[in-house]
């Protein structure tokens, strides 16, 4: 991007009494998954979310009855001493939005379905005049909501979802990040004509790369048009457990690190109050002031197309395990790096989650044939096995010595790098391992890449952040948010996470592959997407996710979405190969891509039926 996003400063809007944007803290929110007509259950869950630390709570209002009942929920919360602003989530129903806008502090609408029916994915070319007439129709449909919001000082979030763009947008722009940003800009301009500025914007997708690109694109468009509305960040259908946290942190953290984002929601297929501690950790890691330590120049460095021979055989970024702290390299040690034990005694299987290279202090006498090691240069010189053992240099050692590996050499540097020395390194047979302490040198890798680009140098880079964490969730969030943007932007050739706290290599190696999996940079297992559920869901989604994973977890590379409802599910699981979508009380529809292939399957049979259909469709 030509525009420095970290110079973007949002304007301030109020969600009830709470200011959002500008220099205010990044606000945290979650969404209930109770039936909005069940006042008692909704109030109890709102309280749990608020007590966990949320600034706002969102509830679904899919119909007028649900919208009207928001008044009862708000009243009961206030009686219990809770005045946290409430947000109504609207799809397909302007009447519900207008009712809710007079009750709650904020209403979320989706440009893809507020004034339009569900996308049919049928191309519908419009002339310029016809296109403008469509915008006029949307303008007319928005006017009642605008008037109600102006009267009640209610804020509107224009929330664009990648999976629910209108046919009009998709025909002209495709199902693309650009189309998402344009969809929001069309609504922004309508609101501006009406002098309505209590707006928040969001660009959401289950694909972190699309979410990041769409949000950056929207920021660029707003800057060019002179707008500065606050931004809500989130990754839809992030899932649960480690994947849910890693996928969310990769997308949200990438943007927070660039100074983009005023409120966040971490969408997990778990109890909604579980989202708040994760969101808090992200916000604590990227507080408002951190961006001012970022380089003035925004990173545009790209990893070179030409790769050393070793990298050409790996489908995606490299993973390196650092075992320099191990006193012995035995079978148990290799298992920590992701290798499996073969039935043949003493031999190993290089599983999909096994590190591609292992850095060690010394070279063992016997190296399992599936393992590739990296050792200090002086050790490598004396080792006879040059096939699976590679040297680790300092830049100075590389320049001073002419004996090198013909295919792959690793050169270790850090924030202390000497650019003149790096100019003398052959990038065709070398990769740079850049090590740094992200707590003290958050943007050291940005400075390094900018310096390389300024000097017309182009290396394959392995980022090697060194953490000191004792809690796995802390490490997951920090590592994913730090590395996600470099992976998504294709700036690096691989990653290697080192942790000096209580979390060991087994966990850091798994985390490396999780980050690559969740950013879809390197697929090593089934890709699962699942929504966090809301009041529209009529079955236990957490149990459904567990069952689907048990049945289909062996299907490497397949993307399977588990969605709570028929309202949003078919659209928002965009890109999934298969979908398991709630269709009513205890019923599930199964989708192949965007086409429903089996309807109203009893929930108890749905996971088995999904697997059966997948197997039947397999070649």
Over which residues does each language-model region extend?
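N-terminal active-site wall of soluble small-molecule enzyme domains
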Residues: 61-103, 327-331, 343-344, 365-369, ...
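Hydrophobic faces of well-ordered beta-strands that scaffold small-molecule active sites
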Residues: 26-32, 57-59, 84-90, 107-109, ...
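Glycine-rich tight-turn/loop motif centered on a GG-T
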Residues: 105-140, 168-178, 381-390, 434, ...
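Alpha-helix-loop-beta-strand connector modules within alpha/beta enzyme cores
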Residues: 66-88, 137-153, 218-227, 377-379, ...
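N-terminal amphipathic alpha-helix/helix-capping segment at the start of soluble metabolic enzymes
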Residues: 1-31, 36, 146, 150-152, ...
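Catalytic alpha/beta core domains of metabolic enzymes, predominantly
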Residues: 125-138, 142, 147, 169-311, ...
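Active-site mouth loops of central-metabolism enzymes
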Residues: 23-41, 85-93, 169-181, 236-246, ...
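Glycine-rich, proline-tolerant flexible connector loops at the mouths of alpha/beta enzymes
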Residues: 33, 54-77, 111-123, 129-133, ...
